[in-house]
Regions:
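Positively charged n-region of N-terminal signal peptides that target proteins for export
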Residues: 1-6
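Polybasic/polar functional segments that serve as interface/processing modules
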Residues: 7-8, 14
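Alpha-helical and His/Cys-centered functional microenvironments
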Residues: 12-13, 227
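C-terminal motif of bacterial Sec signal peptides marking the signal peptidase cleavage site
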Residues: 16-19
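An exposed, glycine/acidic-rich loop-and-rim segment of catalytic or binding clefts
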Residues: 23-67, 73-265
């Protein structure tokens, strides 16, 4: 049996999240409250039902500083992230919905775990070990068809199995999904575990591990939308983002990387 293991840590977001400075309402429209010190906890309730009638849980992680992350089993989605700014005011800094129904029809991948393959595959085709595989073409930027974010029913549209955990200075949830051989056209049975961990240092860490029983292609990504002001009605045009990169990948008219590695300046 052949296996493949992938680990994708998401850089801790404490530096970015501490910069939100809006004292108004959160993106979910909830009034702001002062952080409750020392009230760290993990809880779970039913968030809603999938189209086939299965229950989807939502897990609420709260740290010692009042920071709170909500994650649902549907799509391994980050539903909300409420964090204190430098003045201690709480705000939800990610976009999402108050109920599961919003995600059942959403096509923007708010907060989702995207896979098996995040981003685009030209013409919905790839060749592996001499064999060509054909995938659904569910996107067409510039009128050029491609396979996007795992296909018609990617990781963002399936029900994962969640299990919470607690440790010293942290608490989190492991979400597991087994994608059968041939699902959305991909080879190999793939077992994926996504972990969200909220620490008492105001870090939210996202990590994905995947094991396949056959050679396959894989690119699992997290797809949250951020507005560090905590006000979803405002633009992010005044946000500043620094990337420590010397090169980037240019894309063609269909938003497919050309293969060129270009300098940033």
């Amino acid at each position: 049996m052949k296996s493949l293991t992938l680990v994708l840590p998401l850089v801790a977001m404490s530096v970015l999240l501490s910069s939100c400075d809006n004292g108004g309402e959160s993106t979910g429209g909830e009034p702001q409250t002062e952080p409750v010190k020392g009230a760290q906890s993990v809880s779970e309730v039913i968030f809603g039902q999938t189209p086939d009638g299965a229950d989807a849980k939502i897990f609420t992680l709260t740290n010692a500083n009042g920071m709170e992350a909500k994650i649902t089993e549907y799509g391994a989605i980050l539903v909300s992230l409420t964090t204190p700014d430098k003045n201690g005011n709480l705000a939800d800094v990610t976009h999402g919905y108050d109920t599961l129904e919003g995600w059942l029809t959403n096509t923007s991948y708010f907060g989702a775990t995207v896979g098996r393959f995040g981003n685009r595959i030209a013409d919905g085709k790839f060749t592996l070990d001499g064999k060509e595989y054909t995938l659904a073409t569910n996107n067409d930027p510039g009128g050029i068809p491609c396979h996007l974010h795992g296909g018609i029913k990617g990781f963002d549209k399936v029900l994962w199995k969640g299990e919470s955990f607690e440790g010293e200075g942290a608490r989190g949830v492991n979400l597991t999904y087994v994608s059968p051989d041939g699902e959305e056209g991909y080879p190999g049975t793939l077992t994926t575990v996504v972990t969200y961990t909220l620490t008492d240092k105001n870090e939210l860490v996202w990590e994905a591990r995947a094991t396949s029983d056959a050679p396959t292609v894989l690119n699992i990504v997290h797809h949250s939308y951020w507005n560090l002001s905590g006000d979803a009605t405002t633009s992010i045009n005044d946000h500043e983002l620094t990337l420590y990169a010397e090169h980037y990948l240019p894309t063609d008219a269909g938003l497919i990387p050309t293969g060129q590695v270009a300098p940033v300046a």
